[in-house]
């Protein structure tokens, strides 16, 4: 189980949105690279980065900030937001990115995701952002009629490294993860699922370590870490203890 600290980029700064609203952005750090290094120093093993401007624009909009992050941390980084073509994917992986997250393109062009998995095995994740059980696209600005599980099942057997599942209705408001829908998705597919949206406290960390959540690869935490609601040392100690039990 992995706890992924999140860096969301808007205008080259590290921000958090409330309910996916770009007009409700709180700046937490003007130096994303320094934030990435701080997360590494705290003991985190991975980093989750989202180019928010890119998600809306349909192309990379915070490339300089992402490259600075990649230079600042030795941790593997996964990036989503505005990655829509095989050339985009190849360009980022060649710069040292470990994993790309494909969201809107997974809805618009699922065959591209399948081709990307074939061409870049182990390096492609799918981001499914949901509102009211339906998939949202274009930086959460546009709703679709596609169901979450319906979309996820399109990629069974394709080699998708993980599905990052975000409940938009809980993102950035510290309401707790929607465990019901998250675990339903994890049970419905064989692809590892990463929970996102609403992680609020150590209780959520403990919840993701329960036996019925073992199909999850982990969870993403943003605002709860920035606001000090989750102590990194305590959270990582819980995860370490859980891993020790599994290998005992």
Swiss-Prot record:
EC top class named in words: isomerase
Keywords attached to this Swiss-Prot or TrEMBL record, sorted alphabetically, are: Amino-acid biosynthesis, Cytoplasm, Histidine biosynthesis, Isomerase
Q: Tell me, what is an example of a GO biological process annotation in this record?
A: L-histidine biosynthetic process
Name of one Pfam family that matches: His_biosynth
Annotated localization: Cytoplasm
Q: Which NCBIfam families match?
A: 1-(5-phosphoribosyl)-5-[(5-phosphoribosylamino)methylideneamino]imidazole-4-carboxamide isomerase (TIGR00007)
- HAMAP family per UniProt: HisA (MF_01014)
Protein name in the entry: 1-(5-phosphoribosyl)-5-[(5-phosphoribosylamino)methylideneamino] imidazole-4-carboxamide isomerase
The lineage, from the top, is: Bacteria, Pseudomonadati, Pseudomonadota, Alphaproteobacteria, Hyphomicrobiales
């Amino acid at each position: 189980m992995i706890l992924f600290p999140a860096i969301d980029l808007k205008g080259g700064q590290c921000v958090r949105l409330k309910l996916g609203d770009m007009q409700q952005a709180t700046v937490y750090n003007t130096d994303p690279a320094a934030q990435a290094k701080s997360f590494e120093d705290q003991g985190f093993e991975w980093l989750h980065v989202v180019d928010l401007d890119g998600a809306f624009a349909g192309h990379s909009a915070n490339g300089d900030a992402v490259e600075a992050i990649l230079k600042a941390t030795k941790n593997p980084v996964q990036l989503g937001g505005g990655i829509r073509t095989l050339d985009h994917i190849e360009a980022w992986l060649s710069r040292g990115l470990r994993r790309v997250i494909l969201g809107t393109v997974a809805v618009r062009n699922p065959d591209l995701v399948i081709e990307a998995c074939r061409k870049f095995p182990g390096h492609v994740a799918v981001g499914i952002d949901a509102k009211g059980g339906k998939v949202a696209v274009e930086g959460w600005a546009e709703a679709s009629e596609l169901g979450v599980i319906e979309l996820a099942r399109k990629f069974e057997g394709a080699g998708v490294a993980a599905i990052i599942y975000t409940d938009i209705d809980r993102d950035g408001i510290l309401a707790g993860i929607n465990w019901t829908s998250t675990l339903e998705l994890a049970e419905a597919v064989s692809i590892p699922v990463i929970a996102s949206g609403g992680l609020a406290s150590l209780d959520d960390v403990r919840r993701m370590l329960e036996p019925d959540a073992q199909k999850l690869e982990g969870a993403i935490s943003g605002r709860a870490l920035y606001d000090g609601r989750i102590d990194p040392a305590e959270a990582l100690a819980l995860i370490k203890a859980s891993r020790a039990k599994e290998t005992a």
